[in-house]
Amino acid sequence: IRMNYYAVKALQARAYLWFGDTQKAYEAAQAVITAKDEDGNPRFRLGTAGDFSEGRFTLPCEQVFSLYRFDLQDKYTELFSGDGLYKGTKETTVKKELYGNTGSDIREMNLWNLLVMANKASYYVCNKYQVTEATSEKEEDKVIPLLRLSEMYLIAIEAGPETEAQRLW
């Protein structure tokens, strides 16, 4: 496994928080949150509904560190095309139990698909690792995220000063 600088910083943030060193956890998380590329643009950004509409369900823009799985489309089809892995048969089950039925969470609105079986039974399955035909050649869509920018925000909110937590939230 090869980890770049920001993956190491993200892992440090997670570890420092685990061991109770909130100052170092906050500093490491901030290093990832404020990271810029060579042009001065943010290196990572939080996902948007637009990412989901483009079929990028794992939100590669948020990923600091991930694992590549070349056969992700085949594995997704194997696991989610039947009635083995699903989260309920009603839309309210997914929305209430997982997201609190806010109506504004982009995951609540875009990450679940109603799958109708040959016997007319229907199930809600997660699209997160679905690789669509349009994106199947893109390497970024064949990854399983391990460290994300969103986690760095949560660590910074938990470990940083209260005034900073309000700004980051």
Sequence positions of predicted segments:
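Structured, solvent-exposed acidic/aromatic patches
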Residues: 1-150, 162-164
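Short, surface-exposed beta-strand/strand-loop-strand elements in extracellular ectodomains
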Residues: 168-169
